[in-house]
């Protein structure tokens, strides 16, 4: 058996087509969706991520504002810029690209973003809303993972989902989203003994630890849905995920590739959140 590849690029194109129509309708009413992206420093990977986000906005009818600063920007100056963007009615979403230089506290920065514009979904308020099952912005990567799982057409309710990784940005919110979908969830991490024992029981596995090919075929239940969040650069410069794709696809039922799986969906869900923020703003001028 060879797994079905879950094509994140194809699903993204489908969702972005609908988003572009929503953006056009809002723009016609005088509410063009606007996303502000702040990049501090010269990290090459961050520059690529930001470029992809800006391009996605431009391709789908959203206005983008890119503010680039050198790594010696002070925390106070960054917070001032966020305050100005909070007050800008033409900006509906604000994203500060992580990681930040060491002298800047990422928590302070995240909490400085207005809750109505927290389209990354990382603030304490957004996290609390997710925990309580209330409406709010969902963190883009786990939100995209849920869409990828749903695209398989397989039931989530009643299934056993195992998440490998407990980060604030992926692992923990992923667990909450799966719980909301009525899955039974196990959250594994670096201190979990015999990781394979848990993953072999899973109908759904989400790998998000940043360790190249750590999830092997022997660790996967036949027919499982495998979502690979990892992005690791190999010695030859090529990218690979946290899943041993070539071998695991011989066991799994569905699997996401790297690249072309979770990455495009993360950006798409950022656009979804920005659209949601714009529609709320238009409804409550």
From Swiss-Prot:
EC code(s) of this entry: 1.5.1.5, 3.5.4.9
HAMAP family in the record: THF_DHG_CYH
Superkingdom in the source lineage: Bacteria
Gene that produces this protein: folD
Lineage: Bacteria, Pseudomonadati, Pseudomonadota, Betaproteobacteria, Burkholderiales
Protein name per the record: Bifunctional protein FolD
Function, in words: Catalyzes the oxidation of 5,10-methylenetetrahydrofolate to 5,10-methenyltetrahydrofolate and then the hydrolysis of 5,10-methenyltetrahydrofolate to 10-formyltetrahydrofolate.
Pathway membership, UniProt: One-carbon metabolism; tetrahydrofolate interconversion
One GO cellular component, as annotated: cytosol
InterPro entries: Aminoacid_DH-like_N_sf, NAD(P)-bd_dom_sf, THF_DH/CycHdrlase, THF_DH/CycHdrlase_cat_dom, THF_DH/CycHdrlase_CS, THF_DH/CycHdrlase_NAD-bd_dom
Organism: Verminephrobacter eiseniae (strain EF01-2)
Family listed: Belongs to the tetrahydrofolate dehydrogenase/cyclohydrolase family.
Gene3D superfamilies noted in UniProt: Leucine Dehydrogenase, chain A, domain 1, NAD(P)-binding Rossmann-like Domain
Catalytic activity annotation: (6R)-5,10-methylene-5,6,7,8-tetrahydrofolate + NADP(+) = (6R)-5,10-methenyltetrahydrofolate + NADPH; (6R)-5,10-methenyltetrahydrofolate + H2O = (6R)-10-formyltetrahydrofolate + H(+)
Residues that coordinate or bind NADP(+): 165-167, 190, 231
Gene Ontology MF, one: methenyltetrahydrofolate cyclohydrolase activity
Pfam families in the cross-refs: THF_DHG_CYH, THF_DHG_CYH_C
Assembly mode: Homodimer.
Keywords recorded for this protein, A-Z: Amino-acid biosynthesis, Histidine biosynthesis, Hydrolase, Methionine biosynthesis, Multifunctional enzyme, NADP, One-carbon metabolism, Oxidoreductase, Purine biosynthesis
One Gene Ontology biological process: tetrahydrofolate interconversion
């Amino acid at each position: 058996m060879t797994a079905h590849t879950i094509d994140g690029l194809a699903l993204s194109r489908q969702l972005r087509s609908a988003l572009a129509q929503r953006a056009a309708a809002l723009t016609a009413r005088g509410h063009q969706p606007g996303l502000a992206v702040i990049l501090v420093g010269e990290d090459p990977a961050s520059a690529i991520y930001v470029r992809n986000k800006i391009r996605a906005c431009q391709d789908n009818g959203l206005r983008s504002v890119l503010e680039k600063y050198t790594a010696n920007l002070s925390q106070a100056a960054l917070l001032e810029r966020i305050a100005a963007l909070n007050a800008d009615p033409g900006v509906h979403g604000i994203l500060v690209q992580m990681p930040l230089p060491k002298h800047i506290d990422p928590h302070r920065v995240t909490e400085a973003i207005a809750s109505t514009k927290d389209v990354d979904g990382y603030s304490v308020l957004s996290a609390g809303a997710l925990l309580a099952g209330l409406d709010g912005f969902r963190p883009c990567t786990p939100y995209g993972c849920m869409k990828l799982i749903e695209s398989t057409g397989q039931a989530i309710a009643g299934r056993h989902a195992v998440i490998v990784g407990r980060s604030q940005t992926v692992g923990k919110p992923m667990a909450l989203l799966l719980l909301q979908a009525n899955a039974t969830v196990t959250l594994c991490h670096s201190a979990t003994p015999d990781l394979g024992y848990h993953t072999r029981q899973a109908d759904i596995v989400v790998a998000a630890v940043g360790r190249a090919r750590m999830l092997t075929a022997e660790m996967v239940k036949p027919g499982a849905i495998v979502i690979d969040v990892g992005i690791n650069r190999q010695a030859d410069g090529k990218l690979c995920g946290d899943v041993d794709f070539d071998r695991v696809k011989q066991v799994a039922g569905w699997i996401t590739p790297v690249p072309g799986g979770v990455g495009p969906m993360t950006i798409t869900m950022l656009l979804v959140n920005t659209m949601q923020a714009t529609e709320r703003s238009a409804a409550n001028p």
